[in-house]
Structure formats: C-alpha cells, structure tokens
C-alpha cells in the first residue's frame, strides 16, 4: 500500500514514517521545504520525498492524486477549506483512508485528564481550534 504523509518532517512524521516503512508501506513524504526529520532513522532513506506546498500550489490536489495514494495521513491541515478540497478531490478515487490529525484545541478545556472527547462541551479555544473542530465534524 502507498501512504502519502502531508507535513512529513514534523514531530509526528519523524516517528510515524519509519514505522510505516519498517512495516512494508511504500511511503511518500510531502513537505514545503527540504526539512530534515528530527531523527535520521535508516528508514528515511527508503522514502520518496516530495516538495509541495498546499497553500501556494493551485495544483496541489491534482499532484497529490497523481501519486495514487491508498492512504493519506494529513498532519498539517489547519482549516475546513483544505479538508473539503481533499474530500472532494478524492471522491470516487481509490483512496482507502484519509487520516486527519486534529488537535486537543478543537475540544476546549477539559475538567479532568485524561479526557474523553465525547464528554466535552466542544468549545474550541480559538480560530485554530474552531477550524480543527469544523474539519472533525465534516469528516464524520
């Protein structure tokens, strides 16, 4: 299976990508610039690295589709507009999963920790949290 990771060189991607490669996934790492992962695991040398900027490339979705991913892991989607572009752009394709990385900011303050997201009042903390929450709802 081919997995495309958007925002691959950040904290989560640094550790996720070697696990995917080590488990036999063909992995494509998308970053806006040639950023190095926090740790240079040997698995990173088996990864195809692609420079692509969703905010500044009007053909982002088409270029993403051309990679023919089975799974997309989106670690840097910050607004509902981008979520909808992915969902609409990949409708009817062979995409098996779209994994969207949300944020605790989408849920608001918790009275107890750890918290159950189903028990929260869903009062996002700011615009970032509101956008993440809107994407959460859109993807359900």
What kind of region is each of these model predictions?
Residues 2, 26-28, 96-97:
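Residues at the starts of beta-strands that form the adenosine-phosphate
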Residues 84-133, 137-140:
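Conserved Rossmann-fold NAD(P)-dependent oxidoreductase catalytic core, especially the SDR/UDP-sugar
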Residues 30-35, 53-54:
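N-terminal Rossmann-fold cofactor-binding loop
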């Amino acid at each position: 299976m081919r997995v495309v990771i958007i925002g691959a060189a950040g904290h989560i991607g640094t550790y996720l990508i070697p696990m995917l490669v080590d488990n036999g996934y063909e992995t494509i790492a998308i970053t806006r610039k040639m950023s190095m992962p926090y740790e240079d695991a040997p698995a990173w040398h088996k990864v195809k690295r692609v420079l692509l900027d969703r905010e500044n490339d009007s053909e982002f979705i088409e270029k993403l589709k051309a990679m023919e991913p089975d799974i997309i892991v989106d670690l840097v989607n910050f607004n509902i507009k981008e979520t909808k572009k992915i969902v609409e752009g990949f409708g009817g394709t062979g995409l098996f999963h779209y994994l969207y990385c949300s944020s605790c900011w989408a849920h608001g303050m918790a009275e107890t920790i750890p918290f159950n997201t189903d028990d929260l009042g869903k009062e996002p903390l700011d615009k970032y949290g509101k956008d993440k929450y809107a994407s959460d709802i859109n993807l359900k």
